[in-house]
């Protein structure tokens, strides 16, 4: 189906372009969301009359998005999740979770604006792009941790997974030393008696 784009659509085209898309994409997404019109002669003339108004509305939305982008760019959102010793999450952090976290921080972000190729399934600080407007994109840091203390340590730059591994190594070394001391004591008692 040929459609006239009423706004810039990522990976499709700019406002005013006539593009060919699959029927389902047009009927289920572009047309209901007001992002496109069917490419008929009547709609082409209608678009030409609406073009100035659409450009003005697009410019206003872009300015609003840029104002929010200044505050949002580089923000950090902490997500507390349960995870195994290796840092693998029991579950995942999705676009909805990130959008809810940003909304709780005082920003108006919809889950469709958060760009994730796949859900986050590991501990750590992840950089996630957020598209506020087709022409305005910012990045936020998603800090996935087991608890608030761990989130603070990760925010400072510590790798919590290696810190836990180091703690486990120290504990193992202490256990070996204790076993050696116990063996020495047992050997001394055996030679005395």
From Swiss-Prot:
Disulfide-bond pairs as recorded: none
GO biological process: translation
PROSITE patterns from the UniProt entry: RIBOSOMAL_L9 (PS00651)
Presence of the UniProt keyword Ribonucleoprotein in the record: yes
GO MF terms, alphabetically ordered: rRNA binding; structural constituent of ribosome
Gene Ontology annotations for the cellular component aspect, listed alphabetically: ribonucleoprotein complex; ribosome
InterPro entries cross-referenced by the UniProt entry: Ribosomal_bL9, Ribosomal_bL9/RNase_H1_N, Ribosomal_bL9_bac/chp, Ribosomal_bL9_C, Ribosomal_bL9_C_sf, Ribosomal_bL9_N, Ribosomal_bL9_N_sf
UniProt entry keywords in alphabetical sequence: Ribonucleoprotein, Ribosomal protein, RNA-binding, rRNA-binding
One Pfam family of this chain: Ribosomal_L9_C
Family named by the database record: Belongs to the bacterial ribosomal protein bL9 family.
Record function comment: Binds to the 23S rRNA.
Name the UniProt record assigns to this protein: Large ribosomal subunit protein bL9
